């Protein structure tokens, strides 16, 4: 609202009016001022900069995530296999705080984003191969670019089973105190308790919402151990230290993990094209080193 408009409005207020009338004039002037400010802001060629819902824009980090870092995540939405085409975007949520070597972390609920690389139907049946690549991790502060392989995948029901206590717990006791069996066979002895593998060897500890364990090789299923001997505690959520392959999904196969060419692209084979990937399906990603020839 311009100065001359305020003066004109003031002239309309009767001189010597009682307090109630004066108060109404003041309120009217305030409302007119707000309207004028809004109109001027809308017309400005340089409107105020918008920000993300988190409160500020994430910073694109130039540092790379360490090769071998495990990323436990859950699929956000149910997806029909027949709807998956090249370029289809998929989004996951990180399900446990992921500690980084520099004492930083990727926080729980960070977004893992990827896309369908290709979808190829079987020539001799109703099956289909879906190739996927996950290349971005986003949270309120950071935006990591990365390349990942797929170490393990588990159905929503397998996740539920891993979160179900082995024995009943007392009423009122926190669910995290219960003993549970991780996907792959490790036993988690509650929050703060040890995690032991099938050979009863201690591999880590239970923490709020998951586990921190030393990743183990699973040669029979095709998974390696720690990369270059860098064996540190990693966040695996509901998965065992040697979890590898497909759990609870009978008609799904991991036909290419993404550790070999094409690195960073993994392929799931579905026996029928009318199948679905349910919301809540768990994925265990692993950061890989993208060969120079594949870098864009």
PLM region spans:
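Compositionally biased regions
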Residues: 14, 26, 42-45
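N-terminal secretory signal peptides that target proteins for export/translocation
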Residues: 1-22
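Signal peptide processing junction and immediate N-terminal pro/mature segment
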Residues: 36-49
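Contiguous beta-sheet cores, especially beta-hairpins with glycine/small-residue-rich turns
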Residues: 46, 50-296
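Generic N-terminal simple sequence motifs
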Residues: 10, 41-43, 68
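Bacterial N-terminal signal peptides
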Residues: 25-37
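Short amphipathic alpha-helical "recognition" segments used for binding
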Residues: 6-8, 28, 44, 53
């Amino acid at each position: 609202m311009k100065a001359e408009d305020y003066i004109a409005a003031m002239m309309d207020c009767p001189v010597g009016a009682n307090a109630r009338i004066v108060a109404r004039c003041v309120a009217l002037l305030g409302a007119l001022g707000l309207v004028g400010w809004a109109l001027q802001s809308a017309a400005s060629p340089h409107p105020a900069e918008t920000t993300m819902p988190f409160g500020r824009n994430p910073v694109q980090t130039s540092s790379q995530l360490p090769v071998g870092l495990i990323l436990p995540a859950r699929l956000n939405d149910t997806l029909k296999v027949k709807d998956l085409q090249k370029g289809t975007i998929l989004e996951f949520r990180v399900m446990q705080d992921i500690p980084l070597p520099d004492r930083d972390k990727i926080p729980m609920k960070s977004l893992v984003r990827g896309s369908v690389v290709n979808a190829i139907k079987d020539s001799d049946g109703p099956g289909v191969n879906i190739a996927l690549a996950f290349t971005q991790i986003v949270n309120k502060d950071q935006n990591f670019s990365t390349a990942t392989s797929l170490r393990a995948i588990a159905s929503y029901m397998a996740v539920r089973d891993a979160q179900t206590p082995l024995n009943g717990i007392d009423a009122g006791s926190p669910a995290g105190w219960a003993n549970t069996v991780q996907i792959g066979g490790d036993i988690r002895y509650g929050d703060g308790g040890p995690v032991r593998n099938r050979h009863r060897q201690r591999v880590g500890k239970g923490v709020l919402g998951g586990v921190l364990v030393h990743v183990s090789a699973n040669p029979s299923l095709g998974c390696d151990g720690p990369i270059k001997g860098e064996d540190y505690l990693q966040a695996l959520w509901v998965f065992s230290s040697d979890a590898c392959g497909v759990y609870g999904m009978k008609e799904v196969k991991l036909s290419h993990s993404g550790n070999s060419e094409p690195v960073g692209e993994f392929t799931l084979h579905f026996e029928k094209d009318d199948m679905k990937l349910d919301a809540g399906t768990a994925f265990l990603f692993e950061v890989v080193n993208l060969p120079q020839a594949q870098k864009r």
